[in-house]
């Protein structure tokens, strides 16, 4: 089984970096169901994990994350990044968890590929 880690840094809206990382993650799962895929959000991307955001038009990051978590893709938010933004205690999208750099390091060491957005 191939192991891929996607690390995303961009804000959920205003930049398409996170959007494109999620598009790729969903496409990878559609192409290969026997894939160990993991998603780690850092920097401004951690705000994507907050429940109840209502974008005006276009894509919906919460829906994209829910698609991935429904497929048992682990989605973690950098604890240092959430602490720095004061959002660590706010409600998260179901299936999204706070993670640590140690976890990301472990994921990276066991991965076949690490993709960064």
UniProtKB/Swiss-Prot annotation:
Disulfide bonds: none
Annotated Gene Ontology cellular component terms: cytosol; protein-containing complex
GO MF, one example: identical protein binding
Origin: domain of life: Bacteria
Stored PANTHER family: PROTEIN YCHN
Quaternary structure, from the entry: Homohexamer. The hexamer is formed by a dimer of trimers.
Similarity-based family: To M.jannaschii MJ0989.
UniProt-recorded name of the protein: Protein YchN
Organism of derivation: Escherichia coli (strain K12)
Organism lineage: Bacteria, Pseudomonadati, Pseudomonadota, Gammaproteobacteria, Enterobacterales
